[in-house]
A protein has these predicted regions:
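Short histidine-centered loop motifs in beta-beta connectors
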Residues: 136-144
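Thr-Gly-centered strand-to-loop micro-motif
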Residues: 24, 141, 165-167
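Phosphate/ribose-recognition catalytic cores of enzymes acting on nucleotide-derived substrates
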Residues: 157-197, 219
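Surface-exposed loop and edge beta-strand positions of immunoglobulin-like domains
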Residues: 51, 144-146
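Loop/turn elements at beta-strand to alpha-helix junctions within RNA-recognition modules
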Residues: 67, 146-147
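Short beta-strand segments enriched for Tyr within beta-sheet-rich domains
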Residues: 149-157
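RNA pseudouridine synthases
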Residues: 1-126, 133-135, 178, 183, ...
Length: 219
């Protein structure tokens, strides 16, 4: 398995995780990001996932190459200092061009499975967003989550009235999930920063949202 590397130093690697690949094996096994760990480092104290992405989310994934680096990264995430940027294509689109969603999220389960729901009893969750472009029945959003809840971007977009294109849990679920972990920055010494290119399955939808930069992976 070959996963592109977006950033590397002695402490960290930032991978360009492909959509559809889980970060670790499920109960039934199968391929995962962890399969390439031996090729990243042979140290006894690493590598480690510094955070997680949903299997169907593409883009920046930070891997710590040693335990001390893992603790640094975890502290940055816990303190809300990690700067994360997501690109998403959503169904419809918000009326405004920018805003902030401040809506706590609670995990709920039923016979169909589990999901996150906006609920006052949930954990605090805040996501800033802006519209980068609009197309016919879709919109391209840039989102900056200020907290790190499970499914936060997906659940917040649904709460905004515009679920992600291809989201089987919070939207219609037709086609592939259009969500990219576009960029990440950890303000460490030295900093860790990377930007992921647009995956092939998102290019047409982003181009339809009127931005020529979308098809080349530019900003």
């Amino acid at each position: 398995m070959d996963i592109p590397i977006l950033f590397r130093d002695a402490r960290f690697v930032v991978l360009d995780k492909p959509a559809g690949l889980p970060v670790h094996p499920g109960p039934r096994g199968g391929a995962s990001v962890e399969d390439i760990f031996p090729s990243l480092s042979r140290r006894r104290d690493g590598p480690w996932l510094a955070h997680r992405l949903d299997a169907d989310t593409a883009g920046c994934l930070v891997v710590a190459l040693r335990r001390a680096a893992l603790h640094e990264a975890q502290a940055a995430f816990a303190a809300g200092k990690a700067e994360k940027t997501y690109w998403a294509v959503v169904e419809g689109g918000p009326d405004a061009d920018a805003g902030t969603i401040d809506a706590p999220l609670l995990k709920v389960s039923d016979r169909a499975g589990w999901r996150m729901r906006v609920d006052a009893r949930g954990q605090p969750a805040v996501t800033a967003w802006r519209v980068r472009g609009r197309g016919a029945g879709i919109a391209w959003l840039e989102l900056r989550p200020r907290t790190g809840r499970t499914h936060q971007v997906r659940a917040h977009c649904a709460a905004l009235g515009c679920p992600l294109l291809g989201d089987p849990v919070y939207g219609a679920g037709q086609g592939r999930l259009h969500l990219l972990a576009r960029a990440i920055r950890l303000p460490l010494a030295p900093p860790v920063a990377a930007e992921a290119p647009v995956p092939a399955h998102m290019r047409a939808a982003l181009a339809a949202c009127l931005s020529p930069a979308a098809t080349t992976g530019g900003t």
